[in-house]
Swiss-Prot record:
Region (Trichohyalin/plectin homology domain): 259-425
Quaternary structure note: Interacts specifically with keratin proteins including, KRT5, KRT6A, KRT8, KRT14, KRT16 and KRT18. Interacts with KCTD17.
Regions of compositional bias (Basic and acidic residues) in chain numbering: 168-189
Similarity field: Belongs to the TCHP family.
Organism from which the protein derives: Homo sapiens
Renumbered residue ranges of the record's region Interaction with keratin proteins: 73-498
Gene Ontology cellular component annotations, sorted alphabetically: apical cortex; centrosome; ciliary basal body; cilium; cytoplasm; cytosol; desmosome; keratin filament
InterPro entries: CFAP53/TCHP, TPH_dom
Keyword Transcription attached: no
Keyword annotations of the record: Apoptosis, Cell junction, Cell membrane, Cilium biogenesis/degradation, Coiled coil, Cytoplasm, Cytoskeleton, Isopeptide bond, Membrane, Mitochondrion, Tumor suppressor, Ubl conjugation
Gene (name only): TCHP
Protein name: Trichoplein keratin filament-binding protein
Localization per record: Cytoplasm, Cytoskeleton; Cytoplasm; Cell membrane; Mitochondrion
Disordered: annotated span: 167-189, 447-498
Length: 498
């Protein structure tokens, strides 16, 4: 049996399909491997980032904060439980205490009720006893009032009492008059003593105030003298400041003159170089140097004169400055003599020698001028510094003087204000003491007048009572004499009193 023959294109198609399938499988495996690798790296990145985050300081702080929060919550919870337990115990203790108080109150109410009942019984019995005593007393008073013998005895006793009381009233009146007189004398003596003490106090206060016024006046005079001295000192300081400013301006003017002379010398020197006239130039240059030296000498002489006029420099610095200026003056005079000798010598030189001598002397002159300018600059700078220091010292002294004067003026104003207040207080005190004394005198007079009025009223009342008693007694005696004895009817049997 023969097998069917497969065409060739079918085999190639099958191989192509197999190759495509293998390629797809490989791509699927690669894609799967890529996804696994990417997932692995992604997970690794996530793990590393989480580990880095967890191991970082921020994560540590966050963890510690969370731990602290949990710990604080736990502590708050325990504290809350403890407070609740304590509150529960307090409420239980309070309930127990209230129960005990209620029990004690119930017992005390029973005891109080028993005591009230006992007190009620005692009060009732005491009231019955008191009622009996009052009834007996009333019966006794009724019998005493209606008994004629007792009434006669009472009338006799009353007459004797009136007579005796009249004598006693006379004695009491005399004693009261004597006592009132003694009181008046005592009041007068006390008033006189108080008046003398007040006068002595006022006199002592016046003497003390006069002494204080005298001391204050002396202090004011002293402060005013000091203020005048300070004003004179301020005027002196202002004048001194003006002089210092003038000296500084003079120094500036001298320095400006030196600068102008230097500029003029430079211009003249330039002209001489252009004309090449060495002999004439040497003569003129020598004359110019002499003029410069003369000018420097005049400046130093002026500085010496200013230093002699100065009164506020320290001694050591002043001597140093004087020595420097004197040395500079001596050096300039020596230089001036040397220049004069050179001028005489230059008259004998030839043209070529004069040229060489010109160059040589010009170098020497330049060195000497530089040294001289430096020394003059130092001297002028020192003088300017001294003047500036004087100006500063003068300014500070003026400020101190102004402050002191202002303080003195304030002190004077305070002293005047204090004196005014003390005077007002003294006047008020005098007025108050005067009013107090007048009030005491008026009060004592009023007391004496009230005592006299009361005594007169008492005497008048005593006389009126006595007259009324005598009239009633006489009227009662006449009535009894006219009517005779009449027994009184009694509505109840008499009680035999022992």
């Amino acid at each position: 049996m023969a097998l069917p023959t497969l065409p060739s294109y079918w085999c190639s198609q099958q191989r192509l399909n197999q190759q495509l399938a293998r390629q797809r499988e490989q791509e699927a495996r690669l894609r799967q491997q890529w996804e696994q690798n990417s997932r692995y790296f992604r997970m690794s990145d996530i793990c590393s980032s989480k580990q880095a985050e967890w191991s970082s300081k921020t994560s540590y702080q966050r963890s510690m904060h969370a731990y602290q929060r949990e710990k604080m919550k736990e502590e708050k919870r325990r504290s809350l439980e403890a407070r609740r337990e304590k509150l529960r115990q307090l409420m239980q203790e309070e309930q127990d205490l209230l129960a005990r108080e209620l029990e004690e109150l119930r017992l005390s109410m029973n005891l109080q009720e028993r005591r009230i009942r006992e007190q009620h019984g005692k009060l009732k019995s005491a009231k019955e006893e008191q009622r009996k005593l009052i009834a007996e007393q009333l019966l006794y008073e009724h019998w005493k009032k209606n008994n004629p013998k007792l009434r006669e005895m009472e009338l006799d006793l009353h007459q004797k009492h009136v007579v005796n009381s009249w004598e006693m009233q006379k004695e009491e009146k005399k004693q009261q008059e004597a006592t009132a007189e003694q009181e008046n004398k005592r009041y007068e003596n006390e008033y006189e003593r108080a008046r003398r003490e007040a006068l002595e106090r006022m006199k002592a206060e016046e003497e003390r105030r006069q002494l204080e016024d005298k001391l204050q006046a002396e202090a004011l005079l002293q402060q005013m003298e000091e203020l005048k001295l300070k004003e004179v000192e301020a005027t002196k300081l202002k004048k001194e400041q003006e002089n210092l400013l003038k000296q500084r301006w003079e120094l500036e003017r001298l320095e400006e003159e030196r600068k102008q002379m230097e500029a003029f010398r430079q211009k003249a020197e330039l002209g001489r170089f252009l004309r090449h006239q060495y002999n004439a130039q040497l003569s003129r240059r020598t004359q110019q140097i002499q003029e410069e030296l003369e000018a420097d000498r005049r400046i130093l002489q002026a500085l010496l004169e200013k230093e002699d006029e100065s009164q506020r420099l320290h001694l050591a610095r002043r001597e140093q400055v004087m020595a420097d200026v004197a040395w500079m003056k001596q050096a300039i005079e020596e230089q001036l003599q040397l220049e004069r000798a050179r001028e005489a010598e230059l008259q004998m030189l030839l043209r070529e020698e004069a040229k060489e001598m010109w160059e040589k002397r010009e170098a020497e002159w330049a060195r000497e001028r530089s040294a001289r300018d430096r020394l003059m600059s130092e001297v002028l700078t020192g003088r300017q510094q001294q003047i500036q220091e004087k100006i500063e010292q003068n300014r500070r002294a003026q400020e101190e003087s102004l402050k002191h004067r202002e303080q003195l003026i304030r002190n004077l104003e305070e002293v005047r204000e204090l004196a005014r207040r003390e005077k007002e207080e003294s006047e008020k005190l005098k007025s108050a003491r005067k009013q107090e004394l007048e009030a005491q005198v008026a009060e004592r007079r009023l007391q004496a007048w009230e005592a006299d009025q009361q005594e007169e009223e008492e005497e008048e009342e005593a006389r009126r009572v006595e007259q009324l008693s005598d009239a009633l007694l006489q009227q009662e005696a006449e009535t009894m004499a006219e009517q005779g004895y009449r027994p009184k009817p009694y509505g109840h049997p008499k009680i035999a009193w022992n």
